[in-house]
Amino acid sequence: MSKLPLVLMSAALTSCATLPPSGQPASPAAPTPAPHSASTSRDPFSSTYQAAASPATLIRGATVLTGTGTRLDGTDVLILNGRIEAVGKDLHAPEGANVIDAAGRWVTPGIIDIHSHLGVYPSPGLKGLSDGNELTSPVTPNVWAEHSIWPQDPGFETALEGGVTTLEILPGSGNLIGGRSVVVKNVHATTYQAMKFPGAQQGLKMACGENPKRVYGSKGQAPSTLMGDVAGYRQAFADAQDYRRQWDKYDREQAEYQKKKDGAGSDSGDKKATPPSPPKRDLKLDTLADVLKGDIRVQMHCYRGDQMATMLDVADEFGFKIVAFHHAVEAYKVADLLASKGVCAAMWADWWGFKVEAYDGIQENIAIVDAPAGSCAMLHSDSEDGIQRLNQEAAKAMSRGVRAGLDIPPERAIRWLTINPAKALGLDDKIGAIEPGKNADVVIWNRNPFSVYALADEVFIDGTVAFDRAHPPRKPPSDFMLGQPNAEELP
């Protein structure tokens, strides 16, 4: 066989590996560009995701962890039209419903990973596929992680097998301000738009600490110190405040001009009214202005407790909110401060010590952050490996907390993977809980999900079976997962 057909067959298999489970996303309507304005957020890359049609499903007799702190034994969950219709005992199965006997098994909301780089650093880890850090400037709020996502990353499939239904894909942490993040549904697709969570706010990835000063200090430019880090954030948001004032002034002048123009036919109208000239558009400052308006949610990479406190002061100075600190190895030192400010912390169970700012980690970190009233502790992956077993990572953190004397039953720990990240994404009205009206993102586990032997038996996204361990996926696995022992090289 010639070399070219082999290459074409490989490409075809890879493409087939990511076809949607049923149907095609609706074609977007022809775009109608709106006038730019500082008062409106803009997303020209709209979601084309559409939930696949699915039959009614009744899950019977499971142990249900609702995601909001409640455990329900011997309970049924009814899924209808992609949503959770009812939760209770002895629920009636509609005609034609798929009835699942879940006695002895556990049900949870779909896992939400609030810190993932799947798609922007896909497997295999090649330079040609490494698109997560735009290391040409320390301030790059103009770049969007979604424009680097490769939907065929096999990591999405292995994450799904671990019960992950929603992910926030972020840029890397080499820059002070790394760019916009995006929330995606973990569905098979050939475009990122078909994965994009409809209506989800974007995030802004920011990073404090060692990474930016190492990247740019090694080039002999700012920042090269922690004080250079802080100066960089402050200047960026000072510029954004000025930019926003310019656009607010233009909006006022445009409204006044329109008022005069509309009255031109009357005796009081100004027939010679001149339209105002808009400021020059700046994609970097567009993003930061949207942060100042609260339209983009700040997700901040930060390890040390003292640096988290400093960044909260910077946010207060410029009037924006940091939704969550990520990695947050020393969050236990400022747990009360974070709770009082309503700021979440996304953490690892026990990853620490790999650089100076990560030295003071403790395995009770998540449990301690979870303890104060009003807290918002979360567990994240930041890894194509860890995302496959987030339930086990949470079990480690839960175990360390219990050993330290804290009361952390499964119904409390599951919040770290479900409702808390949903809140941090502004999506807790849609996902993160087993409650009537919520999207039917549901996982059926073969046992207590915090057991080392736990496996996700079935995973539902919007009521559709996205993964079924008993019935291997119909799509062919990717070339990366299979290997290519017979591949021929091109000359």
Predicted regions and their residues:
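N-terminal pre-domain segments of enzymes
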Residues: 19-54, 484-487
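His/Asp/Glu-enriched, well-ordered alpha-helical/loop segment
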Residues: 48, 53, 123-124, 130-136, ...
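Divalent metal-coordination and catalytic microenvironments
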Residues: 62, 77, 82, 104, ...
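C-terminal motif of bacterial Sec signal peptides marking the signal peptidase cleavage site
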Residues: 14-15
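Polyanionic/metal-chelating signatures
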Residues: 155, 160-326, 455, 461, ...
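C-terminal cap of metal-dependent C-N hydrolases
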Residues: 62, 423, 435-479
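Histidine-rich, glycine-flanked metal-binding segment
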Residues: 41-55, 64, 68-108, 125
